[in-house]
Amino acid sequence: MKKNIALMALTGILTLASCGQNGTGTTPTADACATANTCSVTVNISGVSSADFDVTMDGKTTSMTLSNGQKLPVAKTGTVTLTPKAKDGYTTPAAQSTTISSTNLTPSVNFAYTTVPSTGNGNGNGGTTPTQPFTLNITSPTNGAAATTGTPIRVVFTSSVALSSATCKIGNSAAVNAQVSSTGGYCDVTPTTAGGGLITVTGTANGQTVSSTVTVDVKAPVVDNRYGTVTPAGDQELTLTNEGIVKDADNGWRRLGQGVSTPSDPNGNVDIYVKGTVNFSVNAAAGSKVEVFLARTTGSDVPTNDDVQAGDVLRSVASTSGTETFSLDSRRLAEFDGVRKWIVVRINGTQVTYQPVIADNKGPQQPDPELNGVQNAYSNILNNYNNSGLTYVRGDVNVFTGNPSLQDREFGQAPLGSSFVQRRPSGFESIRYYLVPETAFGNKALQESDEMLRAKAIKSVATVVSAPVLEPGTVKATSFSRVIGSGATSTVTPKAQDNVTYRVYAISRDQLGNETASATYELVRFDNVGPTITGSVIRDTSDLPFASQEPERCLSDIATITLGGITDNAGGVGLNPGQGLTFTLGGRQIQAGQFDTNQLADGEYTIGFNSLTDALGNPVVSAPTNAKVYIDNTDPTVNFNRAVMQGTFASGERVSVESDASDGGCGVYETRLFWDTDNGVVDDATTTPAIGHPVQFARQRVTDGAKADSLNAGWNALQLPNGAGAVYLRALVVDRAGNATISTTPIVVNAKITNQARPLLGGFDAFKRNASAQFMSNSNAISGVNGTAVTPNTTANSALDNILSLDSVGTLTTNAYLPRGATETAITEKIRNVGAYGRFDATQWNRIRDYQLNTDPTLRSAYVNAGNLANQRGNNWRIRTPWVELGSSDTANTQQKFDFNSDLLNDFYFGRTFGNNDNVNLFSYDQFNGIVSGTAGAYSFYGETVQK
C-alpha cells in the first residue's frame, strides 16, 4: 500500500508542474532569443588555435576569425552556417549548419584540423615525410551531453596508437593525468561553471601530440528550496589524489553510483557513502521543529512511518537559525555496513524528506602477497633459499597478489525480507605493497589481529612503498603486480636497501579508503654486492741486490705469493656452492710460495682470477690487494757526461761531474757518485796511505718514478801529498724494483805544488747515543779498539731506537801546512772539509757483489743476453765496500770540530722493517769513519770498527 501512496504523490507533483508551465491565452509569442537574450553558437576547434570562417545567417555572409571555444552571439532564432576557409598546412573541414530554437538557444559546432604531410622540399630532391599523426577520439560524453557543476564527468577516449601520456581538462581548469592503455584511456573532470563546457583530451605518442574535444551542457544543480534538504559537510568529501586513489581520512563521505537496485538505469543510482563520523546540515524555517532519524527499510524505496518511528533519533530541536547540523556516527550500526539506510528529516511533524546513505567502515578482502623474478640480466631470485624461509633477491623483484579476484566485503546484514542486492559496499579500489625493515619487526602493532589496525601499523613503519595498483593487469598469475628495485643497476623506483631483511605486506583498499592488511607476509632480503677476495697478495721478497721500493707493484727476481680466500659481503646470500678460487699471472696459474719472476718477460701484468659469483650471481667486487704488478728484471743504465775520461786535474781543483741514468721498467730510484783510488779489488782492507774504498760525494733520489735522472755534482779533487795517479769516478744507480748498475770513468789527479803534507788529526770516537765520547789519538788507519767499542743491540727483534742510534765526534783537526820559503810568511792552504762516513757492512756487500756476479737468477733468464750481462757486471762490480756519506762540513778555517749523528742501519735500507738480526745486518754499517781534507787536496782519514 505504501508504494501506491508514493506513486500518487509523485503524479500529483508532475501534474502541478505541468499546470504551472502551460497557459491557454492568445498572446503572441516573442522570439526566444529576444526573450532570453542569451543566444549564441559555440565554435570548438581542434588541431589549431584559431581559423577563418564565412558565417551566413538570413542570407547574409560575414568573414571573421574565430578562436577555439569562442561564443558567437546571435540575435534571433534561425539557422547559422559556418564555412571554414583554407588554412596552409592543414586539411579544410566541411561546412556545418546549426539551428537556434527555443529548445536549443546555445548550440555548438566542432571543426577538426589535421596536418597535411609534406611530399617534397620544392627543389626536386624529395623531402622528409613526417610521422603520420595518430587519431584520438572522445567516445563519452558526447557533444551536448548534460552535466552538473560540481559533479565529476568520466571521460572515455580511444586512440589509434598506444599513448605514452594523456591529460584531460574542462574549460580553463587545470589539466589532470589520464589513465592510458594500448587503445585509449579515461579520466575524470569536474565542471565548476555553468554553460558550454569544452572538454579537451590531449594525448602524446611517438613524439606527437593530438587533441580531441567535445562540449557538454553544464548546468548548476537544481536547488531544492524546500525545507528538509540534507547536505553533507563539504570539507569531509573524500576526493581523489593525483595517484587516482581516494585520500586518506578516518571520517568522510563520497557519492558513488553502484547501479545495483535499478538495473534499467544503473548510472543514475548514486548514493552517499559514509565512513566514520560525518557532519550534515538540514535547512528549516526558523522556529520549526526539526527531527532527524536514521531509518531502515526492506527495499530501495523510502521508509514508512513505522520505519521512521523505529529508527534512531539523530537530532530533535526547535530551529532558530534556519539551518541545523547533526553528526552521523556510521559505526553505530556496524552490522548494517554496506546496506542502504535513510536519513529522515521531519519538520513540524508533517513535512518529511529522505536522504539515503550507505555506511562502509570495513576494508576489502585480504590480499596474499607473493614474489617472483624479473626477466633482465642483472636480476635473480632465490625463493626459500636453503629452507631458510627467506627469499634472496638481486636487482628487481615482482610483487603481486596470489588471489586476484579481490572484492569489497559485504559485511552488512540485510534486513529481514530484503534481497541480496541490498548489500552494496563501496567497492574495491586498489592494492599497494609495503616493505617493513627488520628494525621494525619488534613492533607489537604488526601483530594486531584487527586487519585494519594492522594496516595502519604497517604504513607507519614501512620504508619502501609501491605505487597503488588499480587494475589487476592482463597476466592472471601475477595480478596487481608492482616491481621493487634494488642495486645501482636497477632503474626502478622505489628501491630497497642491500643487506636488509624486509617483510613484504600487501594492503587492499576500497573506494572510501578503508584498508585491509594481508594476513601473511613474504620475507625478502636484497643483495647486490658480490664476494671479496681477501688476503691475496704477491710481493717482491728479494732484497738483492737492493730492496724494491714498491714491493707489491715492482717485482724483480724472487716474489712471494700469498693466496687468500673469498668471502661474501656481511649479510649476503653466500658464495656460489662448488666454486673455487684460482689465480693466474701472465697466463700461468700460480700457487702459493716463492715465484721466480724471470720466468716472465719484463712488463706490466694483471693478476687474474676465475669468474666467481655469489649464489645470486653478483660478481667479485674487489680484486687482489695488488691487482697489477710490474716485473722488472732489467738493470738500469748510467753514463758519465762529465768528467772527461782520463781528464787531468790538480788536487784541490773542483771537478764537475754529471751522470745520466735511465730505467725502462719501474723507473729510476736513486743515483750515488763515488771517488775511488783502487780498481778491480774485492778484498775489504783499508789500505794506507790511500783509503782504497769508493767514497760517496753526491746522491740524488727520484720520488716520482721517472724513467730518467740526471745528477750534476762537484768533487774537490783529492790526492796524497806530492802524489799523482788515477782516481775512479763511479756512479751507482738503483731502480725502483731494486736492480742496480755501476758505471766507472777514470781521471788523473796530480798533487798541487802546495800539497806537501796531510792535515793533522784530532781525537775521534763513535759511541752510543747518550753515552760519553772517549777520544784517543788517531792515525791514517781504522782501529777496532780506538775508544769505546760501538756494540749495537739487536736482540729480541729490537726496533730502531736510541739504543741503535750513534754519535760520532771529532775534536780539533789542525792544518799541517807550513809557510814555504822566505817570501811566504803565512799559511796559504786551509782545512776545507770534514766529512763523516759509514762503511757498508763488508759481509753484506760481498753478498750483493756475489749475487750480481754469480747467483742472480736473471743471469740464467731466457729473456736477457746472459753472456753480455755477466761480462758487464764483471767489469763494474769488482770494487771494495763503499763508504756512505753521513754528512760533511765545509770550512775555510785552519781547524774544525765536527759532530755527526747516524744509526746502525745504513741509508740503503730504504725504509723496510726488520724482525731479526740478519735483516738488521743486511743493510748496516760495520765502520764509522771520517775524512779531513784541505784546500790543496791533501787528506787524512780515521775511524772505528763496529763490534757485533
Swiss-Prot record:
It comes from Deinococcus radiodurans (strain ATCC 13939 / DSM 20539 / JCM 16871 / CCUG 27074 / LMG 4051 / NBRC 15346 / NCIMB 9279 / VKM B-1422 / R1). The gene is hpi. Shape maintenance, possible protection from noxious enzymes or exogenous and unsettling DNA, and may mediate homotypic cell-cell contacts. Disulfide bonds join 168-187, 554-666. GO terms for biological process: cell wall organization. It is found in: Secreted, Cell wall, S-layer. Residues 1-17 form the signal peptide. The keyword Nucleotide-binding does not apply. Keywords: Cell wall, Cell wall biogenesis/degradation, Disulfide bond, Glycoprotein, Lipoprotein, S-layer, Secreted, Signal. Glycosylated. Contains tightly bound reducing sugars (six per polypeptide chain) and fatty acids (covalently bound and located in the N-terminal region). The hydrophilic C-terminal region rich in aromatic AA could be engaged in interactions with nucleic acids, and the bound fatty acids and the N-terminal region could serve to anchor the layer to the outer membrane of D.radiodurans. HPI layer contain about 30% beta structure and virtually no alpha helix. GO terms for cellular component: extracellular region; S-layer. Its main location: secreted. This is Hexagonally packed intermediate-layer surface protein.
